[in-house]
Amino acid sequence: LRRQRQMCIRDSLYTHWNLDGASVLAAQCLDVQPGHAVLDLCAAPGGKSITLAQKLWPELYADHPSRTSTTHASILHSNEVDPARLRRLHANLKSYLPNTLMDQGLVEISRIDATSPRAVQLFPLGEKGYDRILLDAPCSSERHILHAYMRAQQSGTAAPEMLAWKPTMSRSMSKTQLALLRTAWAALRPGGRLVYATCSLSEQENDHVVRAFLTSTPEAHVLRTDSLVHFCQQTEYGYFALPDYMIPGTEQRSPWGPLYFCMLEKP
């Protein structure tokens, strides 16, 4: 989605978000339906939460923000542990979502450290409380490094993302990611779906994390769909949207990513 964000003057809500298509694809793979209880575990800055809200309340638009359906009890809980990112998340959701959703308690924002063993007890719906969970985990962020490199080429200066990156980040991040994945699984209802995603290029943060999780949680079911190969490279457990991926049967490259994601279902 590459449109300039616009504001609906009457209701002071923004109508567009510039979000990488791979991020939209990962959110769509959750198969969110009206009436679901959804948790966006690491939600800042908020683009994916807004994408999920569009699926939960398809009848709401920026120019008709008060038309909240009462025929289904959709719930969206957006969580972020970092204080600065939490403030940004809150500001963005207020800028895009009708106030009525928060006023009625249908959308809630929380600050919970989801790596804690007790985290699942602190979520509003608790253990096994959510039909769908999106875990866009913090990572070593090579995707942002690539974007920073392109900006640095244009400006001639090193971006903060490039200066902060270290080769050992993947090893430490994978431990955090596995803890987050286990918390997300505990919060998922039987029959529910979870999408684990990162913008890292490192297998240590992607399939390696999923492999470690499946070793301790063998009942988890990895979901596959043939349609994704038109947009992504298939990996052992998930999919990789890469900007140099050649779309099968064409001479076109995918303009999205990089983003890794894996779909898991709880029996």
Mark where each language-model region is:
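Conserved alpha-helix/loop element of class I SAM-dependent methyltransferases that forms part
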Residues: 20-36
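Helix-to-beta-strand junctions that scaffold the AdoMet/dcAdoMet cofactor pocket
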Residues: 60-61, 188-189
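S-adenosyl-L-methionine
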Residues: 79-127
